[in-house]
Amino acid sequence: RGALDVHAVKREFATDRPVTTLREALVGADVFLGVSTAGVLDADMVRSMAGNPLVMALANPDPEISYDEAKAARPDVIVATGRTDYPNQVNNVLGFPYIFRGALDVHARKINEAMKLAAAHALAELAREEVPADLAAAFGVDRLEFGPDYLIPKLTDPRLLGRVAPAVARAAVESGVAQRRPDIE
């Protein structure tokens, strides 16, 4: 934790525990965030994590651990992958088009942290709202509601454009990088 060669942002997440492997690091961990390669996480590692762990296995096309294997390891695990065929698909398509649309709408000089945070907050708010029945039906379910299997909106949610892009545009205006101020509801 006190290492001089670790950036201050990373230092906050460092540990004083003597760990040298991923397996050791995951003991009691709340979150696994993987963007590496298939198979680096196994069921025993998931079982060693804290209660209700979040496993974000985002390697594509095959995640660090499959959704089914993670759920079989422990039913309380919350799993997100980059795959469309499982709950909680994490995909940059949820951000980039709407961040760019919001930036273009206000002729933003740059895309800053405030704009990215606005996009993240808009996605989080949308995930907590009631999902239209036709969208749920498109995924073969009667209902989608915020919880372990629905943390993030679906890529095909038609409400994304009307929520995320305006939030980004508003943040650009408020943070001073917008060159024009369109009507934002």
Report the location of each language-model feature.
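Conserved acidic residues
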Residues: 30, 53, 77
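Glycine-rich phosphate/diphosphate-binding loop of Rossmann-like nucleotide-binding domains
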Residues: 1-37
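A short, aliphatic-rich alpha-helical micro-motif
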Residues: 25-26, 46-49
